[in-house]
């Protein structure tokens, strides 16, 4: 709540599609969409119908439904990994695959990208200090151990830094987004992702790709779009239409290795899974969302609108010669307070301007638009319209004009 702009948070009354209404009756165009949790649009009809039906048939029984097989097959088709396990969130999915990676490699450490976010996973709240040492990020409260015991941090797009981190021979896994989305959008440079894959193979390190946000590029995320071959893939949020859920996929080789190493009689003490993981309600939501909402046709529309949104922002920035820029990732776009697009998480973090950001968010809110409060990101959903995007472009242009005049 503290991240929202203004003295008081907006309390929501109801939301549908690309809009929501607050308790005072004000209507907003939603470009935040629950920070991707509602990338489907709020309460998509197909997902709501599936939830209603399943709620009457049983919410959870700690046994699989037919939807488990249907959803697994759909995920395999989209992302290219044959086997899937379900969790309650993408955070849990990341926790579980880190544990599996340590089991499979016999190694203790993971590599993460500076200024990454993968949910509330203890090992990921690390950054680099001024001399390149791994330290806890500011605000990381109650860390169970010093972060340099569990983690090595590497800058995004730094292939030499990645090899240096892996060369110690003690890294179980690399956990990364294929494009950074939680410190602003930072895109991979040509050849970077392919080089990371090759380094993971060279040093016997497991590659985990987190597609929770980068699914904005299409039905199979950047994994399908770039032809990536991760060992594990994690995702959550949007695939359930807003119902808490997560999942992780794995290669057949990984699955076979796990089967050989995990003893059935002690599997419930392995730190993997949860009583509500893969419950019937969340699987019904995933099936309906993947089948009827996050479709090729809807992604095609959303990506066109994402381009239109970014073009509108770029036009205003150019017209008023502001030292800003705009990055885009499929259906997602972001204003950046710097003329040069960031190459690393540190670049993106250093381009931040807290007071300007607070003003911009509050101004957009007063003009009837909600954007993601942690930075300046906007996301399109199947219900977003060209008129919504053009209205934002007009409001953004007016704001830029007033800032220049001031």
Tell what function each PLM region has.
Residues 1-406:
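Conserved N-terminal phosphate-binding loop of PLP-dependent enzymes in the Aspartate aminotransferase
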């Amino acid at each position: 709540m503290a991240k929202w702009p203004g003295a008081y948070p907006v309390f929501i009354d109801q939301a549908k599609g690309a809009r929501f209404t607050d308790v005072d009756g004000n209507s907003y165009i939603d470009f935040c969409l629950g920070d991707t949790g509602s990338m489907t649009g709020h309460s998509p009809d197909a997902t709501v119908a599936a939830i209603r039906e399943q709620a009457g048939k049983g919410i959870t029984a700690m046994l699989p439904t037919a939807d488990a097989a249907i959803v697994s097959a759909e995920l395999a088709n989209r992302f290219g990994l044959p086997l899937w396990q379900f969790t309650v969130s993408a955070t849990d999915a990341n926790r579980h695959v880190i544990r599996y990676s340590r089991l499979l490699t016999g190694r203790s450490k993971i590599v993460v990208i500076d200024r990454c976010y993968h949910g509330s996973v203890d090992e990921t709240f690390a950054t680099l200090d001024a001399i390149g040492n791994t330290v806890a990020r500011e605000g990381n409260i109650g860390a169970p151990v010093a972060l340099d015991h569990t983690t090595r941090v590497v800058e995004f797009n730094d292939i030499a830094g990645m090899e240096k981190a892996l060369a110690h021979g003690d890294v179980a896994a690399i956990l990364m987004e294929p494009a950074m989305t939680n410190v602003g959008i930072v895109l991979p440079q040509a050849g970077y992702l392919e080089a990371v894959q090759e380094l993971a193979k060279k040093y016997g390190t497991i590659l985990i790709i987190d597609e929770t946000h980068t699914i904005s590029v299409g039905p199979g995320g950047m994994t399908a779009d770039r032809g990536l071959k991760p060992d594990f893939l994690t995702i959550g949020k949007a695939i359930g239409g807003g119902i808490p859920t997560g999942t992780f996929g794995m290669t057949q080789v990984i699955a076979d290795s796990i089967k050989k190493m995990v003893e059935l009689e002690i599997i419930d003490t392995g730190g993997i899974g949860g009583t509500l993981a893969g419950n019937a309600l969340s699987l019904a939501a995933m099936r309906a969302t993947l089948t009827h909402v996050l479709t090729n046709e809807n992604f095609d529309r959303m990506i066109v609108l994402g381009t239109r949104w970014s073009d509108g922002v770029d036009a205003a920035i150019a017209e008023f010669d502001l030292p800003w820029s705009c990055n885009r990732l499929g259906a997602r776009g972001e204003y950046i307070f710097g003329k040069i697009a960031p190459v690393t998480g540190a670049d993106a973090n250093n381009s931040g301007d807290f007071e300007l950001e607070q003003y911009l968010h509050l101004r957009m809110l007063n003009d009837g638009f909600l954007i993601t409060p942690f930075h300046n990101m906007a996301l399109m959903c199947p219900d977003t319209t060209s008129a919504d995007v053009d209205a934002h472009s007009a409001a953004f242009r007016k704001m830029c004009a007033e800032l220049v005049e001031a």
